[in-house]
């Protein structure tokens, strides 16, 4: 089981600084969509240039022109790139192809997918590296959790890894870990903690069953 830190609300310098503080406890560091909107792909490059032994994910949430956008993210140092599960099949297939051609990985974000079971099966067959169930900020505010979605997707896929994101914190991560996802994505639960290193350490301990 892997742990990913999602960083959404910092500039690229502060993001790299935070990532380096917790890198002993995480496997993947994400440059979140808001940072990419604010600072562009150079934010991904800054992270890639300033951290080692950790994969860098660019949360592009690609919807179209997928092979080009994947190739650009890779050019700027991304190891993992995200595309939306609601994108056209053709877009997802070319994104997977482009990522794999460069020995990189593609994560498909299931945010706003209505028929999770059907889409997860399709994406699994297409060769997605990760399929991520994701309760976005706006639904978290309504009290929703990704737990049920995680169970649904995990029950139907054969090859892809299952990732889970959405409001996960050190004090709630154990119920997520109990469902055995392959990748747990924690954002504010680490980034906004009073002590991010301690929060990351607690999350790592939870996924290692300690």
Swiss-Prot record:
Catalytic activity, reaction form: D-ribulose 5-phosphate + formaldehyde = D-arabino-hex-3-ulose 6-phosphate
GO biological process: 'de novo' pyrimidine nucleobase biosynthetic process; formaldehyde assimilation via ribulose monophosphate cycle; L-ascorbic acid catabolic process; one-carbon metabolic process
EC number(s) given by UniProt: 4.1.2.43
SMART domains on file: OMPdecase
Pathway: One-carbon metabolism; formaldehyde assimilation via RuMP pathway; D-fructose 6-phosphate from D-ribulose 5-phosphate and formaldehyde: step 1/2
GO molecular function list: 3-dehydro-L-gulonate-6-phosphate decarboxylase activity; hexulose-6-phosphate synthase activity; orotidine-5'-phosphate decarboxylase activity
Record's protein name: 3-hexulose-6-phosphate synthase
Protein source organism: Staphylococcus aureus (strain bovine RF122 / ET3-1)
């Amino acid at each position: 089981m892997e742990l990913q830190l999602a960083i959404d609300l910092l500039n690229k310098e502060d993001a790299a600084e935070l990532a380096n503080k917790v890198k002993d406890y995480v496997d993947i560091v994400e440059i979140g969509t808001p940072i990419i909107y604010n600072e562009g792909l150079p934010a991904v490059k800054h992270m890639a240039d300033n951290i080692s032994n950790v994969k860098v994910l660019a949360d592009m949430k690609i919807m179209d022109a997928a092979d080009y956008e994947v190739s650009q993210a890779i050019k700027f140092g991304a190891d993992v790139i995200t595309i939306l599960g609601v994108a056209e099949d053709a877009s997802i297939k070319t994104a997977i192809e482009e990522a794999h051609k460069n020995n990189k990985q593609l994560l498909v974000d299931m945010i706003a997918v209505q028929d999770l079971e059907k889409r997860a099966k399709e994406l699994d067959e297409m060769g997605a590296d990760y399929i991520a169930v994701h309760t976005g900020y706006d639904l978290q505010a309504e009290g929703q959790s990704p737990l049920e979605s995680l169970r649904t997707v995990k029950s139907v896929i054969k090859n892809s890894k299952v990732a889970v994101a959405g409001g996960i914190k050190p004090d709630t991560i154990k119920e997520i870990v109990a469902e055995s996802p392959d990748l747990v994505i924690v954002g504010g639960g680490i980034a906004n903690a009073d002590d991010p290193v301690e929060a990351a350490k607690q999350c790592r301990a939870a996924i290692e069953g300690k």
